[in-house]
Design a protein with these regions (language model features):
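A SAM-dependent methyltransferase catalytic signature shared across enzymes that methylate proteins
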Residues: 181-198, 215-218
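Acceptor-substrate binding/catalytic loop of class I
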Residues: 166-183
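Conserved class I S-adenosyl-L-methionine
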Residues: 14-57
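Core SAM-dependent methyltransferase catalytic element
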Residues: 200-218
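A short glycine-rich, Lys/Arg-flanked "PGG" loop and its adjoining helix->strand segment in the class I
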Residues: 138-150
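A conserved beta-strand element that flanks and buttresses the S-adenosyl-L-methionine
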Residues: 124-125
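Conserved beta-strand signature within the Rossmann-like core of class I S-adenosyl-L-methionine
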Residues: 151-158
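Class I SAM-dependent methyltransferase SAM/SAH-binding core
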Residues: 63, 69-113
Length: 218
């Protein structure tokens, strides 16, 4: 765990930590420019994005949850001919996304309270879903199911084991949480997803733990 030094009274520090834990987007608002400058430009996620693309129809609709500034994942999907809607709770990150892709649709929303009038061929929650507290994560699988067409694909990242962690980025604390793999499997099964791929700690992809699943409602 990495936290900024205690430079305020203990109660204020505790309240600040709890706010950062429950609403990571507030931290991203503070580091949006830093993140845009320091996130690696290369698409190390490409093998997973390419596999997803092979499972989608031409010009498929994709919902990018936690799209950030849209680079590099959303940009790559757009270049491939897909229709992408970006959602993020960070206003500052979304401002950058709109500058990067002015012709695209972006929505300022917390994924936990998602409200969109469309269903999609795929949902991506890459390095965004795992910023939610563990107590909020199970509820997301109903949301994933609600916004996918039958046969739609879900691509998300998690931790490799149950727990919490903090990382210091641009001088701000970023909270991460994960359930364990069996919990995710049960949640996917309960919400009628079939697991296509589960890779743990992929060293070629920044040690990401990646899930790809298909929504097959009965």
């Amino acid at each position: 765990m990495i936290l900024k030094p205690l430079d305020e009274n203990p109660r204020a520090f505790f309240l600040n930590v709890m706010s950062e834990k429950e609403n990571v987007y507030k931290s991203y608002d503070k580091i949006a420019e830093w993140f845009a400058s320091n996130r690696p430009g290369q698409l190390i996620e490409k093998p997973y994005i390419d596999r997803l693309q092979l499972l989608l129809p031409n010009q498929a609709t994709i919902l990018d949850l936690g799209c950030g500034n849209g680079k590099p994942i959303m940009g790559y999907l757009l270049q491939s001919g897909f229709q992408v809607v970006g959602v993020d709770a960070s206003e500052k990150m979304l401002d950058l996304a709109k500058q990067n892709f002015p012709a695209e649709t972006f929505l300022l929303q917390d994924m936990r309270k998602l409200q969109i009038g469309n269903k999609f061929d795929a949902i991506i929650a890459w390095h965004s879903f795992f910023h939610l507290p563990a107590i909020d994560q199970p509820k997301m699988f109903e949301i994933f199911a609600n916004y996918l067409v039958p046969g739609g694909m879900l691509l998300f990242t998690s931790g490799s084991e149950r727990g919490e962690a903090w990382g210091l980025n641009g001088g701000e604390n970023l909270f991460h949480a994960s359930l364990d793999s069996d919990e995710y499997r049960l949640l996917l099964q309960h919400h009628q997803f079939e697991i296509i791929n589960h890779t743990v700690n992929d060293a070629a992809c920044g040690n990401a733990t990646v899930w790809l699943a298909q929504f097959n409602p009965q």
